[in-house]
């Protein structure tokens, strides 16, 4: 009977894959076809993601998951006892086991953790069930790597599920008070990212709350085939450098159905990222949804195939932004921002190629090339006089900028060194300089 059930499961999964292939072929695309000067379908990329995810799903579905609880390894969950070693021991057991494994952090408890690195590769198909609260130590001496609190490193086919009750709490107030951005008399020092995923393939993060990170809340670095959904990320508007979801050097990632309010970018997308899908995001407070900053310290930067489709931004310092330093090189290309509502947003649409967050930035000849960017079905109100700003490089002007059915009230448009085409009704219209 069990064998028959497994065969039925495989058949149903095969049918699901066939359906997803058909659906993928109808998806509006985000890859630019230069021969036809239009965007073409990313269905082949989508199909590769489906195959990779299906393989892991089938393997896990054919086994009954084993549960490994941190409580079985001595975790107290009283919010006072250091539970770091219990988590490390539970991880080693779960990672080294065969088949599907659930690593359980029980609901209703608070687990105090120092910095912790959970490394792969793992034998198991692993789901980390964070149903309780993870609470960060506030002692600087408890961090072996001052830039990271919880890190998953080199773990393929990993799922992290908060079950709608799980919380990752960075207890960032102590770190913010010592930030040079809050107190100019303080030296600028590093602070931990709350949750880091590094060098991992086929990653799922869902149903999780992350709050008050010491610095960045969730960082996804050097990963591929990633799905992030139904996460709630919060920090005060004045908390320094608390980016919500930070994506760098990552390919084939989708972030969807999430609520983000922070003291920095709600979502930031940096160099090396390709085929990024952002859907159904609520953002505010924060600095908006940003690509960059790119080209820092005269570096090469490449970002391509980014689609932000469905977002509501309220009271943010920026709306949708591309930011690059002078002196860099490379490209930011094939980007779509569409179906976006802005409510009282400063700088709703902005490309800034003179970005500088340092004490001194010099004028340079080289720049990251920004090209093939579409803004479609964007409406709302500007909280500043600048509703649309294209401040592009004199030496490498922005190319292929399209405004299609854009209606932002309360501000003007200024377009410098930008090749802009209007489609449909556009308000305000560019005053090119």
UniProtKB/Swiss-Prot annotation:
PbH1 repeats lie at residues 223-249, 250-271, 273-293, 303-324, 332-353. Residues 1-24 form the signal peptide. Its main location: secreted. Its EC number is 3.2.1.15. SUPFAM superfamilies: Pectin lyase-like. The active site is at residues 264, 287. Expressed in roots and in the abscission zone of the sepals, petals and stamens of flowers, at the base of cauline leaves and in the basal cell of trichomes from senescing leaves. Found at the site of lateral root emergence, in the dehiscence zone of anthers and maturing siliques. Also expressed early in anther development, at the time of microspore separation. Expressed in germinating seeds, at the point at which the radicle broke through the seed coat. Not expressed at the junction between the seed and the funiculus or in the dehiscence zone of anthers or pods. GO terms for molecular function: polygalacturonase activity. SMART domains: PbH1. Induction: Up-regulated by ethylene. One of its GO terms (cellular component) is extracellular region. The keyword Signal applies. It is found in: Secreted, Cell wall. Keywords: Cell wall, Cell wall biogenesis/degradation, Glycosidase, Hydrolase, Repeat, Secreted, Signal. PROSITE patterns: POLYGALACTURONASE. One of its GO terms (biological process) is fruit dehiscence. The keyword Signal applies. Disruption phenotype: No visible phenotype under normal growth conditions. Small delay in floral organ shedding. It catalyses: (1,4-alpha-D-galacturonosyl)n+m + H2O = (1,4-alpha-D-galacturonosyl)n + (1,4-alpha-D-galacturonosyl)m. Belongs to the glycosyl hydrolase 28 family. PANTHER family: PTHR31375. Polygalacturonase involved in cell separation in the final stages of pod shatter, in anther dehiscence and in floral organ abscission. This is Polygalacturonase ADPG2.
């Amino acid at each position: 009977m069990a064998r028959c059930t497994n065969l039925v499961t495989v058949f149903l999964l095969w049918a699901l894959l066939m359906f997803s292939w058909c659906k993928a072929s109808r998806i509006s695309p985000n890859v630019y076809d230069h021969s036809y000067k239009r965007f073409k379908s990313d269905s082949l990329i989508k199909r590769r993601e489906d195959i990779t995810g299906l393989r892991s799903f089938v393997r896990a579905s054919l086994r009954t998951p084993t549960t490994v609880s941190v409580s079985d390894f001595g975790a107290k969950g009283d919010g006072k006892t250091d539970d770091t070693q219990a988590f490390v021991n539970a991880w080693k057991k779960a990672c080294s086991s065969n088949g599907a494994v659930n690593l359980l952090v029980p609901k209703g408890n608070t687990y105090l953790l120092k910095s912790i690195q959970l490394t792969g590769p793992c034998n198991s198909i692993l789901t980390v069930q964070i149903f309780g609260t993870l609470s960060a130590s506030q002692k600087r001496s408890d961090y072996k790597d001052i830039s990271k609190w919880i890190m998953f490193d080199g773990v393929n086919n990993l799922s992290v599920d908060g079950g709608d009750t799980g919380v990752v709490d960075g207890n960032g107030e102590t770190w913010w008070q010592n930030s040079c951005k809050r107190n100019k008399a303080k030296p600028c020092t590093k602070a931990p990212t709350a949750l880091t995923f590094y060098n991992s393939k086929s990653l799922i993060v869902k149903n999780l709350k992350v709050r008050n990170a010491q610095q960045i809340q969730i960082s996804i670095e050097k990963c591929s085939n990633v799905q992030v959904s139904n996460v709630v990320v919060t920090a005060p508007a004045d908390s320094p450098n608390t980016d919500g979801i930070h994506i760098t050097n990552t390919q084939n990632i989708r972030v969807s159905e999430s609520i983000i309010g922070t003291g920095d970018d709600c979502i930031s997308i940096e160099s090396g990222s390709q085929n990024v899908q952002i859907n159904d995001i609520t953002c505010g407070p924060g600095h908006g949804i940003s690509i960059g900053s790119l080209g820092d310290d005269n570096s090469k930067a490449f970002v391509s195939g980014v689609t932000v489709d469905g977002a509501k931004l309220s009271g943010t310092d920026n709306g949708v932004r591309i930011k690059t330093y002078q002196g860099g090189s490379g490209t930011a290309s094939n980007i779509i921002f569409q179906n976006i509502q802005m409510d009282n947003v400063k700088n709703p649409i902005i490309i800034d190629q003179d970005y500088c967050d340092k004490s001194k930035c010099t004028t340079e000849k080289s720049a990251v090339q920004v090209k093939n960017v579409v803004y479609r079905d964007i409406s709302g109100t500007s909280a500043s006089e600048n509703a649309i700003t294209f401040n592009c490089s004199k030496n490498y002007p922005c190319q292929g900028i399209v405004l299609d059915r854009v209606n932002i009230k309360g501000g003007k448009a200024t377009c410098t060194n930008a090749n802009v085409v209007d489609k449909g009704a556009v308000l305000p219209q560019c005053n090119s300089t």
